[in-house]
């Protein structure tokens, strides 16, 4: 849109970390481009790219973090609320161990917001991530809450976030275990109403399993009787 020259290197078209080291790939691409965005799995890969590229490297998504999504989500919350960011309360409900749960917790803490995680304790962010969030909150005045009760998490919030319950690369068998753990953390009209805020808004980084109109959605309905998974 802005007239930049863009090259897309798909996984099968790059030898990064396979026949060519990440360090060498970073040095070559850094001589050819003004910036690099990496979207993949390991956080250590994007950090090594940033160490050796010599140009800005953007994290488009890793297993651990999704910072570019946070830029979009912070802007969206600001645009759709009359409050400044440090007065906004939001909750993330669902599996909070991966990039969206980690990143939203740290975003809220860094921006001085009232951020809540609602999930079974087994699916909370790691102790290291929680400690980082609490340390940031001490500096910014943020309020950080983690609870195993979905209704408690959403009480009084302005926004409710969620994400898929089974991530890319996880086996199909994971669904049964994850649904058993998270069924009470689905975002439903009842959970939205539990916020007590008639203007509460729902956010999802997408794609969402919210109905039967996909192959996975239909399989989940036939197997588990759910029309929609993390949201319905």
UniProtKB/Swiss-Prot annotation:
Disulfide bonds: none annotated. Transmembrane segments: none annotated. Keywords: Amino-acid biosynthesis, Arginine biosynthesis, Cytoplasm, Transferase. GO terms for cellular component: cytoplasm. One of its GO terms (molecular function) is ornithine carbamoyltransferase activity. It catalyses: carbamoyl phosphate + L-ornithine = L-citrulline + phosphate + H(+). Pathway: Amino-acid biosynthesis; L-arginine biosynthesis; L-arginine from L-ornithine and carbamoyl phosphate: step 1/3. GO terms for biological process: arginine biosynthetic process via ornithine; citrulline biosynthetic process; L-arginine biosynthetic process. It comes from the Bacteria. The keyword Cell division does not apply. It is found in: Cytoplasm. The record marks 79 as: Important for structural integrity. Pfam families: OTCace, OTCace_N. The keyword Transferase applies. L-ornithine binds at residues 99, 163, 167-168. Belongs to the aspartate/ornithine carbamoyltransferase superfamily. OTCase family. NCBIfam families: orni_carb_tr. This is Ornithine carbamoyltransferase.
